[in-house]
Amino acid sequence: MAKIVDYGAFADRLKAAPNRWDVLREFHEEWGYAVRPGSDRWDRWTEDEHETYVRALSGEPRDEDGLEGVDLALPIPAALDEWWELPFNSFTHDSQHYETNPVYPPTVRPDPSGYGVAGPLQDDSDLVAPDADRRVCVFMAENQYCNEWGYLAAEAHDPDPRVLVSVDDDRWALQARSVSEFFLQLTVQRLPRTLGWSAEIYDGEEIIDGDEDDLRARITERMPELGFEPWAELQQDTIVYGGPDVLAFVADGELGGIAFAGRTPRAVLDLAERLGVKLTEEDLTEPGEY
């Protein structure tokens, strides 16, 4: 990791990138992830499941075919299938880093099978026209289904539609500008704190110059955001800020907090010093194995 990556310029990098898959591949490389030769791969469906789906599309009788909740009239966006096939995809090779469950093919909300917990897009949302289809097609969920992520059925024909997140059982919020950006954002949330050097900063600790509110203010003033929508999960909204080889995760809500993750221990310690946090290398969590 001799070359320093300035995540303070990440928002500009997003704007300049021709597509999100290039940035996703680079991000994997920057944090030291590589698919292990011969490792198992999570396929989006088995051969039998795919055959069942194709038969259902052709109009053959559907009797307990395992596709409850799937609207066969809706296409699956190209970006979702592309993500499953990415050769460098850390989710499909090491899903333990993510603590989420994929849903494939996507199922609609409200879910006619009764399995999905969220409802349709709320009536007062301006994310679609008043007379548009307000169903949401869910393709990913938090392990306990506390949050679900999906795209609007009204946008299912788009190759890379916007992604919404369920913030409670009857409300959805915008999570990402596209499916491909969602997966980049999910990786940013997961890999650095697993494969990098990290530290959780807790309010009330004497290591902070001032209190947590002072630290939040310094981060906001001195570090640029990465350019994503706030990450909504488990009743927290997390904004990620960038610096040289380092990220700061700032979450609000009842379970909110602050965390640093760096490609090197020096990057985390330098950030801590700039922000008035007293840390030593012994305070850092070392990168995990995969």
Predicted regions and their residues:
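A surface-exposed partner-binding patch
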Residues: 1-158, 193-202, 220, 225, ...
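Hydrophobic beta-strand residues in large extracellular and virion-surface proteins
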Residues: 80-83, 163, 248, 258-260
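Short amphipathic beta-strand/extended segments with alternating polar/hydrophobic composition
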Residues: 149-153, 173-179, 270
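Intrinsically disordered, low-complexity regulatory segments enriched in Ser/Thr/Pro
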Residues: 151-154, 158-167, 254-263
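Signature of lipid phosphatidyltransferase scaffolds
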Residues: 170-197
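Short Lys/Arg-enriched alpha/beta "domain-start" segment
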Residues: 187, 192-233
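Extended, charged low-complexity segments
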Residues: 233-290
